[in-house]
């Protein structure tokens, strides 16, 4: 099920996306049109199988655009091939707690406007900023079809998908 803004993006096509993921898929489509140089799209969402979830979401949007006649089936084939577009799984040992009023106050004191913390009717707390703990470690599936920077020099661990999945537990 798509969020309403993403569903509207499917109807509008890749030329006028509004949702962040729709914008990303639109940029992937532009890359495809420009020759399809391989790329890795890395999710830093702190959830299990994040690469799979990101891939599935990107494909859902692209399939909607293909059904609507906005993109050719070749784009879906390109996007589906992990030698063209990979979605490495990752696991980050970092907790992002609820937004802190102290951080909101600090940002406001610095002159940043609109730092109000809100709570939805379902109890979800959100803010236009993120406060987080310092990262302890980052584990990435080493599947980058066009190469990657030497992030292991900064302490990132590269491994296979099975090891990333084990580290999630």
Region locations from a protein language model:
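Substrate/ligand-engaging "lid" and interaction regions
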Residues: 1-169
């Amino acid at each position: 099920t798509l969020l309403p803004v993403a569903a509207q993006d499917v109807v509008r096509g890749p030329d006028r996306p509004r949702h962040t993921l729709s914008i990303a898929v639109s940029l992937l489509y532009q890359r495809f049109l420009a020759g399809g140089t391989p790329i890795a799209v890395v999710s830093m969402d702190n959830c299990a199988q994040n690469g799979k979830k990101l891939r599935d979401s990107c494909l859902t949007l692209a399939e909607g655009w293909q059904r609507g006649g906005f993109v050719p089936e070749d784009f879906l084939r390109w996007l589906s091939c992990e030698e063209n577009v990979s979605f490495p799984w990752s696991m980050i040992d970092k907790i992002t707690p609820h937004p802190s009023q102290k951080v909101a106050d600090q940002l406001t004191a610095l002159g940043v406007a609109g730092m109000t913390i809100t709570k939805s009717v379902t109890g979800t707390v959100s803010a236009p900023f993120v406060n987080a703990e310092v990262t302890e470690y980052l584990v990435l599936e080493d599947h980058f079809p066009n190469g990657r920077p030497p992030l292991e020099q900064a302490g990132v661990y590269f491994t296979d998908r099975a090891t990333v999945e084990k580290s999630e537990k």
